[in-house]
C-alpha cells in the first residue's frame, strides 16, 4: 500500500495543505541539463541516498493576519506562531513513520527549489514561493520517499509575477533590489533571526517586531484571498510586554524564554538574540519608532 495516504492523513490533521511528489531521477536529470539555472545551483543531493526514489513536499497554509498589538508590546510574524504549532503536531507523527524506513524527514535540502520544481508554487520577486491556493502563506517541509508512488511531473516555470513589483517597492531597506534575490545584509528579518549587530539605520525600521517582517508579503496580490483558517491568537501581554524583558530583578531573561517558545519555538526564543532585539524594540517604542 502506498505511503502517500499516511502522509496525507498527517498533513490533513495539521492544517489545510498541498502535497506534490517528484522523482529523484527527474530532479537529477533536470539539474544536469540546467547547471546554470539559479534553482539548480541551490539544489544538492547530500540528504538523498541511493534507495530514495523521490521527494514529497508539503505546504501547510497559515493565516498572515496580525492581531491588534497592545500598547507596550512587541510583535511576531504569524509565520512563527503557526510553524511552531504545526511542527508540534506533525513532527512526532512523521518521526513514527520514519522509523518504518519508508520516509526520511529532510532537514537541509533547499525547500524553495523543490517547491518550485514540484509545482507547489512559483518564485515571487521577493524570493518567496507562492501559489494560487494559499498565496505565499504556507510553511513547507520535505520528505524523502523510499518506494514507487504516483509522481507529479516537474514544473518548468520559475515565476508568474510578470511586471508586478509591489513587493520590491514595499521593502523599506531595498533588500529586494534585484528581482527574485534577497540581499540578506539589507533584510530586517535576517538581523532579527541571527542576533548579529544591526546597522543603526535599520533599527527604527524594525519598530516593535521581535521576529519577522512580512511587508513584502502583505502587498502581494497573491495574498489577497481570505485565509482558510483563523488568525493567530491575541498577544499575551505577560509574554509580549517589552518591560518584562528590560526590568532587572525578579525573573531572569532565561526564565522568560519558555513562555515565549510556546509562541515562536525554541529556536527563536534564545536569550541572547531576544535581548538584542528587545533593546531595539524598547527604544523604538519609547521614541515612537518609524512606521
Predicted regions and their residues:
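Iron-sulfur cluster-binding cysteine motifs and their immediate structural context
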Residues: 166-189, 206-236
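Core register positions within helices of long alpha-helical scaffolds
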Residues: 277, 281-284
Amino acid at each position: 500500500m502506498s505511503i502517500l495516504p499516511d502522509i496525507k492523513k498527517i498533513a490533513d490533521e495539521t492544517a489545510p495543505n498541498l502535497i506534490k511528489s517528484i522523482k529523484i531521477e527527474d530532479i537529477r536529470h533536470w539539474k544536469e541539463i540546467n547547471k546554470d539555472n539559479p534553482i539548480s545551483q541551490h539544489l544538492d543531493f547530500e540528504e538523498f541516498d541511493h534507495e530514495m526514489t523521490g521527494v514529497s513536499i508539503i505546504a501547510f497554509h497559515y493565516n498572515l493576519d496580525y492581531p491588534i498589538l497592545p500598547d507596550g508590546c512587541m510583535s511576531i510574524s504569524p509565520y512563527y506562531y503557526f510553524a511552531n504549532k504545526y511542527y508540534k503536531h506533525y513532527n512526532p507523527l512523521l518521526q513514527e513513520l520514519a522509523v518504518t524506513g519508508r520516509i526520511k524527514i529532510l532537514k537541509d535540502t533547499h525547500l524553495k527549489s523543490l517547491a518550485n520544481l514540484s509545482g507547489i508554487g512559483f518564485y515571487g520577486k521577493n524570493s518567496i514561493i507562492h501559489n494560487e491556493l494559499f498565496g505565499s502563506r504556507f510553511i513547507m517541509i520535505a520528505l524523502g520517499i523510499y518506494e514507487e508512488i504516483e509522481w507529479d511531473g516537474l514544473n518548468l516555470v520559475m515565476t508568474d509575477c510578470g511586471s508586478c513589483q509591489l513587493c520590491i517597492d514595499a521593502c523599506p531597506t531595498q533588500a529586494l533590489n534585484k528581482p527574485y534575490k534577497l540581499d540578506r545584509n539589507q533584510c530586517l528579518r535576517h538581523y532579527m533571526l541571527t542576533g548579529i549587530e544591526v546597522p543603526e539605520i535599520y533599527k527604527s525600521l524594525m519598530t516593535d517586531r521581535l521576529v519577522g517582517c512580512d511587508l513584502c508579503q502583505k502587498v502581494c496580490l497573491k495574498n489577497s484571498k481570505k485565509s482558510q483558517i483563523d488568525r493567530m491568537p491575541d498577544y499575551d501581554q505577560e509574554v509580549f510586554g517589552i518591560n518584562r524583558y528590560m526590568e532587572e530583578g525578579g525573573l531572569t531573561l532565561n526564565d522568560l524564554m519558555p513562555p515565549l517558545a510556546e509562541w515562536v519555538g525554541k529556536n527563536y526564543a534564545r536569550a541572547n538574540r531576544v535581548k538584542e532585539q528587545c533593546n531595539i524594540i524598547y527604544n523604538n517604542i519609547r521614541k515612537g519608532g518609524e512606521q
